[in-house]
C-alpha cells in the first residue's frame, strides 16, 4: 500500500477527509490557483480550438501536470502539517491505515 493510499483510507475512515478537502479547496481559491488553472484551460482550448475532436479527457491530461506544479509550496506544507496533526491526534485510536 502506498503512503497516498494509506492516508486516503485513514482520513476517510476517521472522517477527516472532508475537512482536508475543504481546507485545500479554500487555500487554492485564496491563493488564486483556481483562476490560474481556469486561464490555463482557456489558453489550451484556444490553442486547440481548430481540433474539433479535442476531448475533456485530453484537456484534463494536458492540464493536470501543469496545474499540480502551480500549487504553492505554502499550501502543500499546510496540508502536510494538517495530515500529520490528524495522524498524531488519532495515534491511539483503533484505526490503522495498514489494515484499511
Swiss-Prot record:
<dbReference type="GO" id="GO:0033696">
    <property type="term" value="P:heterochromatin boundary formation"/>
</dbReference>
<keyword id="KW-0963">Cytoplasm</keyword>
<dbReference type="GO" id="GO:0006368">
    <property type="term" value="P:transcription elongation by RNA polymerase II"/>
</dbReference>
<dbReference type="GO" id="GO:0070390">
    <property type="term" value="C:transcription export complex 2"/>
</dbReference>
<dbReference type="InterPro" id="IPR018783">
    <property type="entry name" value="TF_ENY2"/>
</dbReference>
<keyword id="KW-0653">Protein transport</keyword>
<protein>
    <recommendedName>
        <fullName>Enhancer of yellow 2 transcription factor</fullName>
    </recommendedName>
</protein>
<dbReference type="GO" id="GO:0070742">
    <property type="term" value="F:C2H2 zinc finger domain binding"/>
</dbReference>
<dbReference type="GO" id="GO:0015031">
    <property type="term" value="P:protein transport"/>
</dbReference>
<dbReference type="GO" id="GO:0043035">
    <property type="term" value="F:chromatin insulator sequence binding"/>
</dbReference>
<comment type="similarity">
    <text>Belongs to the ENY2 family.</text>
</comment>
<dbReference type="GO" id="GO:0003713">
    <property type="term" value="F:transcription coactivator activity"/>
</dbReference>
<dbReference type="Pfam" id="PF10163">
    <property type="entry name" value="EnY2"/>
</dbReference>
<keyword id="KW-0509">mRNA transport</keyword>
<dbReference type="GO" id="GO:0006406">
    <property type="term" value="P:mRNA export from nucleus"/>
</dbReference>
<comment type="subunit">
    <text>Component of the nuclear pore complex (NPC)-associated AMEX complex (anchoring and mRNA export complex), composed of at least e(y)2 and xmas-2. Component of the SAGA transcription coactivator-HAT complexes, at least composed of Ada2b, e(y)2, Pcaf/Gcn5, Taf10 and Nipped-A/Trrap. Within the SAGA complex, e(y)2, Sgf11, and not/nonstop form an additional subcomplex of SAGA called the DUB module (deubiquitination module). Component of the THO complex, composed of at least e(y)2, HPR1, THO2, THOC5, THOC6 and THOC7. Interacts with e(y)1. Interacts with su(Hw) (via zinc fingers).</text>
</comment>
<keyword id="KW-0010">Activator</keyword>
<dbReference type="GO" id="GO:0001094">
    <property type="term" value="F:TFIID-class transcription factor complex binding"/>
</dbReference>
<comment type="function">
    <text>Involved in mRNA export coupled transcription activation by association with both the AMEX and the SAGA complexes. The SAGA complex is a multiprotein complex that activates transcription by remodeling chromatin and mediating histone acetylation and deubiquitination. Within the SAGA complex, participates in a subcomplex that specifically deubiquitinates histone H2B. The SAGA complex is recruited to specific gene promoters by activators, where it is required for transcription. Required for nuclear receptor-mediated transactivation.</text>
</comment>
<keyword id="KW-0539">Nucleus</keyword>
<dbReference type="GO" id="GO:0045944">
    <property type="term" value="P:positive regulation of transcription by RNA polymerase II"/>
</dbReference>
<dbReference type="GO" id="GO:0071819">
    <property type="term" value="C:DUBm complex"/>
</dbReference>
<keyword id="KW-0811">Translocation</keyword>
<dbReference type="GO" id="GO:0000124">
    <property type="term" value="C:SAGA complex"/>
</dbReference>
<dbReference type="GO" id="GO:0005737">
    <property type="term" value="C:cytoplasm"/>
</dbReference>
<keyword id="KW-0813">Transport</keyword>
<dbReference type="GO" id="GO:0005654">
    <property type="term" value="C:nucleoplasm"/>
</dbReference>
<dbReference type="InterPro" id="IPR038212">
    <property type="entry name" value="TF_EnY2_sf"/>
</dbReference>
<keyword id="KW-0805">Transcription regulation</keyword>
<dbReference type="GO" id="GO:0005643">
    <property type="term" value="C:nuclear pore"/>
</dbReference>
<dbReference type="GO" id="GO:0016973">
    <property type="term" value="P:poly(A)+ mRNA export from nucleus"/>
</dbReference>
<dbReference type="GO" id="GO:0034399">
    <property type="term" value="C:nuclear periphery"/>
</dbReference>
<keyword id="KW-0156">Chromatin regulator</keyword>
<keyword id="KW-0804">Transcription</keyword>
